[in-house]
Amino acid sequence: MAFLKKSLFLVLFLGLVSLSICEEKERETKEEENEQEDDNREEKRFLSLIPHVISAIPHVVNALSNLG
């Protein structure tokens, strides 16, 4: 009977350990996906600013030419 209890505890322990490892890998995968999404959002924000910067260049050039 004691052998059966020890075996059952061992099986439960190993099952919990493997479950914990799987959950940790899943968590890491989700974190990596979130980081990639954040990077994509930042890139899109940057790209949306380019037309505004380009349209501001003539104003900056005019302001600099008026100073000189």
UniProtKB/Swiss-Prot annotation:
Pfam family, one: FSAP_sig_propep
Function comment: Weak cationic amphipathic alpha-helical antimicrobial peptide with weak activity against Gram-positive and Gram-negative bacteria and fungi. Has been tested against E.coli (MIC>217.69 uM), S.aureus (MIC>217.69 uM), K.pneumoniae (MIC>189.00 uM) and C.albicans (MIC>217.69 uM). Shows a moderate hemolytic activity.
Coiled coil: none
Leader sequence residues: 1-22
Propeptide: 23-45
Annotated GO CC locations: extracellular region
Species of the source: Agalychnis spurrelli
Keywords assigned by UniProt, alphabetized: Amidation, Amphibian defense peptide, Antibiotic, Antimicrobial, Cleavage on pair of basic residues, Cytolysis, Fungicide, Hemolysis, Immunity, Innate immunity, Secreted, Signal
Family designation: Belongs to the frog skin active peptide (FSAP) family. Phylloseptin subfamily.
Signal recorded as keyword: yes
Residues with PTM Leucine amide: 67
Record protein name field: Phylloseptin-SP1
GO BP term (any one): killing of cells of another organism
Domain of life per record: Eukaryota
Subcellular location: Secreted
Tissue: Expressed by the skin glands.
